């Protein structure tokens, strides 16, 4: 009996080590492909039509697009409304869809809600594990926000998105 439990324990440890190796190995850059164009102000961005399983959670007023912040690294953006910009940054492990219920309660005729999805999550590019750092995420989000030519924003950050988002401003 104890021998069998020992084998089971050893097997679980080995599986855990294999899993840890698989999760932390380098990985490779995966760049998503969009289609079409989305006009934001006087700029044009690569459109990202939402798949049906995601589109059912938002209204047709939402704009879904990519901003390429470095070669091959794209940040997926969701945006809705017109008026004063509100920048909402989700944390781990979620995406811009986190804020959809909050957005439902906002006066979208007076606010423009901008919701990037962190690199590595959702529809944004996937990068090797070694590239996930506060400094890199700050830089990528800063580049995305700079493309939108925002003079000022109201900022909302949650979890990991708090430090990353505030660093991007």
Where are these regions (language model features)?
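Aromatic pocket-lining residues of Rossmann-like dinucleotide-binding sites
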Residues: 106, 168-169
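Gly/Ala-rich beta-loop-alpha elbow adjacent to hydrolase catalytic centers
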Residues: 157, 161, 165
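Active-site signature of alpha/beta-hydrolase-fold catalytic machinery across serine-
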Residues: 101, 167-168
């Amino acid at each position: 009996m104890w021998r069998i439990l020992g084998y089971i324990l050893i097997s679980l440890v080995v599986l855990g080590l294999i899993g840890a190796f698989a999760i932390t190995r380098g990985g490779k850059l995966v760049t998503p492909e969009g289609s079409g164009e989305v006009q934001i102000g006087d700029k044009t961005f690569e459109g990202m039509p939402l798949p049906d399983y995601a589109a059912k959670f938002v209204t047709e007023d939402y704009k879904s697009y990519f901003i390429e912040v470095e070669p091959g690294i794209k940040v997926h953006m969701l945006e809705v409304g017109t008026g004063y910009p509100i920048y909402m940054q989700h944390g781990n492990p979620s995406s811009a869809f986190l804020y959809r219920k909050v957005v439902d309660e906002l006066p979208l005729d007076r606010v423009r809600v901008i919701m990037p999805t962190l690199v590595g999550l959702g529809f944004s590019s996937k990068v090797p594990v070694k590239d996930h750092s506060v400094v890199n995420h700050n830089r990528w989000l800063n580049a995305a926000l700079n493309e939108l030519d925002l003079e000022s924003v109201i900022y909302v950050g949650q979890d990991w998105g708090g430090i990353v988002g505030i660093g991007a401003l």
